[in-house]
Amino acid sequence: MANELTWHDVLAEEKQQPYFLNTLQTVASERQSGVTIYPPQKDVFNAFRFTELGDVKVVILGQDPYHGPGQAHGLAFSVRPGIATPPSLLNMYKELENTIPGFTRPNHGYLESWARQGVLLLNTVLTVRAGQAHSHASLGWETFTDKVISLINQHREGVVFLLWGSHAQKKGAIIDKQRHHVLKAPHPSPLSAHRGFFGCNHFVLANQWLEQRGETPIDWMPVLPAESE
């Protein structure tokens, strides 16, 4: 069945493309020359490690990784335990508090428990130089993540895409809205959240869609790994 395909099955060929090898080489060269790149090399592909292709229920698109020390670990919007929750994620928590009964804002910003339930937290650019937003925007990552989105579009059905802000919405233009459920809103950043992210109800609507399809809804309360054992 289609949803038994793995990321390896569908991306192995893409990862041999010259542009992709060049992207990896450029990032590796910068690291070797002493430039601090986030996230650490072992974490660059964590979105795919934590959420297998056949398990994807929801896709949340970010832009590029956080560029402060210790923040980025390969999942869009998420930060490691012990790192202050960034403003956009705080606004996501605020929307959850306002719409999900019983949701209480956690004291961390670690979203692995979302990823493990089938929420693909995908940045469209997978690396960044320390302190320099969008510094790797033209390295080829966008081509790769465009391919990822097209593969989800092609191989899965009934995935909820949460597209926040114009960048994510442009990126998601290829999604077949007959096969998938696309929800759009302004970005949760403090600059734009008040223009319609607050009140968009996306977390509730995503779960309603999943339940209508007979799938388990997402528990949006982020849980640290030790707490979930």
Curated annotation (Swiss-Prot):
Q: Name one GO molecular function term.
A: uracil DNA N-glycosylase activity
Q: Which reaction does it catalyse?
A: Hydrolyzes single-stranded DNA or mismatched double-stranded DNA and polynucleotides, releasing free uracil
The primary site where this protein sits is cytoplasm
- Annotated active site: D64 (proton acceptor)
Where is it localised?
Cytoplasm
Keyword annotations for this protein, in alphabetical order, are: Cytoplasm, DNA damage, DNA repair, Hydrolase
Q: Which SUPFAM superfamilies match?
A: Uracil-DNA glycosylase-like
Give the CC-aspect GO terms. cytoplasm
Record-listed E.C. numbers? 3.2.2.27
Q: Name one GO biological process term.
A: base-excision repair, AP site formation via deaminated base removal
Give the stretches traversing the membrane: none
Query: What are the boundaries of the signal sequence?
Result: none
Kindly give the Pfam families that the UniProt entry links to this protein.
UDG
Q: Which PROSITE patterns match?
A: U_DNA_GLYCOSYLASE
Matches recorded under InterPro entries:
UDG_fam1, Ura-DNA_Glyclase_AS, Uracil-DNA_glycosylase-like, Uracil-DNA_glycosylase-like_sf
Q: Which residues form a coiled coil?
A: none
Chain's role: Excises uracil residues from the DNA which can arise as a result of misincorporation of dUMP residues by DNA polymerase or due to deamination of cytosine.
Family of the protein in this entry? Belongs to the uracil-DNA glycosylase (UDG) superfamily. UNG family.
Q: What is this protein called?
A: Uracil-DNA glycosylase
Instruction: State the organism named in the record.
Output: Escherichia coli O1:K1 / APEC
The gene from which this protein is expressed is ung
